[in-house]
Amino acid sequence: MIYRSKETVCSITVPRDPEYLALVQDILEHPLVRSMEAYTQHGETSCLRHSINVSYLSYLYCRDHGWQARAAARAGLLHDLFLYDWHFHAKETGNYFHGLTHPRRALENAQRLFSLTDREKNIILRHMWPLTPIPPKSVEGFVLLYADKFCGTAEVAGRIKHLLGPVLRPRQSV
């Protein structure tokens, strides 16, 4: 499936999918969630853009398989709600274990702002498996886990391709 139409929310394009937006609009409109735009996640991708990517991909896959698309969409937007730039976090705090600790921080922040189901809580808390030792309990958790890895890889690869573009272009014969 190809979804091309988009609308802008806080300078970020989001899918113009009425069913998806109905599930996540309250999250997208929250000022602290919108502040994720200020933090870089992968390459030049903001934490908000990454979370929207993960959320929508997880939503589509779960919807198309008859699983709990709402839980996947909402947890996807909140899975990285740690609210700091992890590139500088270790130097500033001495915490060198962002990969291990940010799921709990994201969950704590999400619980302060929104009412979450047990499934959504587990998806957020377990999205870094196998780096963290306990896997998700639900199929939606595994979908989000893989969507997160896929989107992160694509975001970094896009940056690498941009940087290496001049090197990778074929030479023109003279």
Protein language model regions, located:
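Metal-dependent phosphohydrolase cores
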Residues: 1-174
